[in-house]
Regions:
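Conserved short strand/loop->alpha-helix "switch" segment adjacent to the catalytic nucleotide/phosphoryl-transfer site
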Residues: 34, 39-63
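Short, well-structured hydrophobic secondary-structure segments
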Residues: 61, 66-71
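Conserved beta-strand-loop-beta-strand hairpin that lines the nucleotide-binding pocket
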Residues: 1-24, 70-142
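Extended, non-globular alpha-helical segments
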Residues: 17-18, 23-43
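Residues at secondary-structure transition points
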Residues: 27, 49, 53-56, 60, ...
Length: 142
């Protein structure tokens, strides 16, 4: 039985970062979360999170970013995670150059909380528009 992750190259215990491209299909929300979980699991072997909640917050933020990329920026997206001095830098690059627009939450319509949730979870959030899309950068505690 192979111990290689499902999403690509195996990560070493000393992995400082991981970058994974996705085609932008519905199943990629789960795949992005699994890729992040694999990276964080490997990272935790050498540097455990200060709180178990930090891992869960990062996974939730990755899921929300991936879902937003699929819904609002049709096409491929790239997920990157990198260890920083005191946390994790998450980047999602997608094909839509427009910055996210927060929506009001409507219980009957669903949705509307993802961007607010991302901003609440992260210590810092920035959006970097480009000619071919944008990058959303999050810094979360670890």
């Amino acid at each position: 039985m192979s111990s290689d992750p499902l999403w690509g190259d195996p990560l070493s215990e000393a992995a400082d970062s991981v970058t994974v491209p996705f085609p932008g299909e519905l199943g990629d929300v789960t795949a992005a979360r699994l890729a992040a979980a694999g990276y964080l699991g490997t990272l935790a072997l050498g540097q455990p999170p200060a709180s178990a909640e930090h891992r869960d917050d990062i996974l939730l933020a990755v899921s929300e970013l991936a879902a937003n990329a699929i819904q609002y920026a049709p096409g491929p997206f790239v997920l990157s995670l990198r260890r920083t001095f005191d946390g994790i830098h998450v980047v999602v690059a997608d094909t839509n150059p427009d910055p996210p627009e927060p929506r009001r939450y409507h219980p009957s319509k669903g949705g509307g909380i993802g961007w607010h949730l991302i901003q609440a979870l992260a210590d810092e959030v920035s959006v970097v528009p480009g000619d071919d899309g944008k990058e959303i950068h999050l810094f979360l505690p670890w």
